[in-house]
Structures are given as C-alpha cells and as structure tokens.
Amino acid sequence: VSIIPTGGAGGYTMPLPERDEMYNTKGKMLQDITVDLGGRVAEELIFGDITTGASQDIKQATALARAMVTQYGMSEKFVLMGLESRESMYLDNGSVLNCSDETASHVDEEVMRILKEAYEEAKRLLTENRECLDQISAFLIEKETITGKEFMEIFHKVRDEANEYHQEELIFAE
C-alpha cells in the first residue's frame, strides 16, 4: 500500500496473489470487493466524511460485483444465468447484457446488494480493528508506503496488546 500520488491516483494498493489461481471462488471475490471498499469506509471512520480518493476502488468493486452477477452466475437471483456476452473485438470488445430491461434493473439491484453487504462487512472489520487502522494510518503518514510484512507486524502487535489487556481485565475481575 502506498499513499504516494502516482499516475493521477492519490495512492495505490496492489495485492499480491497468495498462490497461482486460475479460477476465483465466490468467497474470494466477495473478499476482494470488501477490501476494495475498505478505503471509503476508512475515510468515513477517520474523517467523518468521504472524498473522491476511493473512486477507482469503487469502480473496481462495482465491476467485480457486476461480473459475479452477469458472467459467473454467483448471485442469489441469477444463479445459473450468464447474462452478459462480449462483443466482437472490432467493436471495442465491450459487453452487452442479454436480457430485458426489467431483468437489467434486477441485475442493478443485485449488484447494489452485493456492494452494500461488502461495505457493511468492511465497516464491521475496520470498526472492530480501529486501533490497528489508526496505527497503520500513522505508519503510512510517516513512511508513505507499507509492505504486507510491515502491515502484518502492526496487526499482530495490536492484536497481542489487546489480548494482554483482556487477560489483565479478567484477572482483576476475579
């Protein structure tokens, strides 16, 4: 993760693949959407307001949620339906929904449902881990970039401190 502005972006997150995956699972895609929306949630939690900074993340989350619904049959409403097809590469290789206007409206509703659920999950996770969020934010303000290893070190340190605090709380309660 970097907060150094590059190429018109205010910062950049590049997840490294944990292993070679030819196919993504529904669960993994939902996690990716949740991560994509984490920046917007963090803005709300920290600043009490939102900015344009998460626009690319929102675009990416929306595209992934839409693909889950229209291409991969990974939604509750359209389980076994492929609703989207790719146009010829001579026509900009765009995609076309192969459904009625009413079904397209339901697709939009399903995409919004997926995004809202992922947003609420990101909010829950960041609220529960607020101390970690604050420490990682402070690290980024100082260093401008954080590696996955540095991120996990901070995460485990905060978790260990929280566990120690709760252990002491239990001892004093007895």
Residue ranges and their predicted role:
Residues 1-174:
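Soluble catalytic regions of large protease machineries
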